[in-house]
């Protein structure tokens, strides 16, 4: 059952919201198409502090230039359903309650195994921009399962009554602006929260797909412009984490700043 309640969000500060852009497909010299290539900056690594988390909501707190949304601190149910868990949190912030398994069940699936190339990496596999790729109970390093990118998650959010907007190229300023408005944000990065150079496989339809081991999606729930930090729920472990804005911005580059915003329609 989906339960709707009036949202309760506190926020302080004002940032400029940049317009969303659609994910392009590039035509390569050999006539094939590709999702965008990502260029990574060189930035220092940062220690990631953790706090214990339960299924109870976090406390909404504000200070000058800071926002922390009321969000449940939950853990993903399955090995690779971080995107569904992240959306569950994002919807809950908007007071739209949808079970994690229901979100995952609504996603299009491509369970076909990959074609492994000569270096032991997938040369062909499904397109996570269209489907959940692989077995949700699989293991990424063995390429038995992978995940899903933002377009199907946008569709799922809209299915449950939210307004969702997804694109690549998210910046920290855009994230903070959305949080200031009380909107939820989900960002794609890797589970070690560090920048990586993505690899590419070719989808069944010939489109090149960027990928990285440890693909992960997290709901961002707060920021502090004085401490220069970003706070999010790590649904892999069910904890709240805080990174420096510099470290978070670097981690986002692995998937080209991929993310979605989610807001209520009431």
Region annotations inferred by a language model:
Residues 1-5:
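Terminal targeting segments of Actinobacterial cell-envelope proteins
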Residues 7-13, 20-150, 191-193, 198-202, ...:
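Active-site-adjacent structural segments surrounding the nucleophilic cysteine of cysteine proteases
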Residues 81-83, 165-166, 185-189, 219, ...:
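Structural recognition of the beta-strand scaffold that forms the well-ordered cores
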Residues 83-91, 100, 104, 150-158, ...:
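Extracytoplasmic/secreted envelope proteins and their assembly/folding machinery
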Residues 86, 168-170, 189-193, 222-224, ...:
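A mature extracytoplasmic/lumenal domain signature
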Residues 134-172, 177-180:
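Mid-length scaffold segments of soluble, non-membrane domains
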Residues 158, 180, 201-212, 219-266:
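Noncatalytic regulatory segments and standalone regulatory/sensor domains
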Residues 176-195:
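Short, solvent-exposed, low-complexity loop/linker segments
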């Amino acid at each position: 059952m989906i339960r709707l309640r009036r949202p309760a969000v506190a926020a302080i500060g004002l940032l400029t919201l940049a317009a969303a852009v659609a994910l392009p497909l590039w035509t390569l010299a050999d006539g094939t198409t590709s999702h965008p290539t990502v260029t990574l900056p060189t930035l220092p690594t940062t220690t990631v502090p953790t706090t214990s988390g339960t299924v109870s909501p976090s406390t909404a707190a504000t200070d000058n230039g800071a926002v922390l949304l009321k969000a449940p601190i939950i853990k993903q149910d399955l090995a690779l359903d971080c995107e569904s868990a992240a959306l569950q949190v994002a919807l809950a912030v908007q007071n739209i309650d949808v079970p994690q398994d229901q979100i995952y069940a609504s996603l299009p699936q491509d369970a076909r195994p990959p074609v492994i190339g000569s270096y032991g990496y997938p040369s062909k596999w499904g397109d996570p921009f269209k489907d959940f790729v692989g077995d949700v109970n699989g293991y990424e390093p063995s390429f038995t399962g992978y995940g899903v990118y933002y377009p199907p998650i946008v569709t799922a959010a809209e299915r449950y009554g939210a307004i969702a907007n997804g694109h690549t190229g998210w910046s920290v300023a855009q994230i903070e602006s959305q949080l200031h408005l009380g909107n939820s944000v989900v960002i794609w990065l890797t589970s070690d929260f560090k920048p990586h150079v993505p690899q590419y496989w070719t989808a069944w339809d010939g489109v090149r797909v960027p990928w990285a081991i440890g693909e992960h999606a997290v709901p961002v729930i707060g920021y502090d412009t004085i401490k220069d930090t970003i706070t999010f729920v790590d649904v892999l472990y069910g904890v709240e984490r805080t990174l420096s804005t510099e470290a978070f911005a670097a981690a986002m580059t692995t998937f080209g700043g991929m993310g979605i915003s989610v807001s209520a329609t009431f």
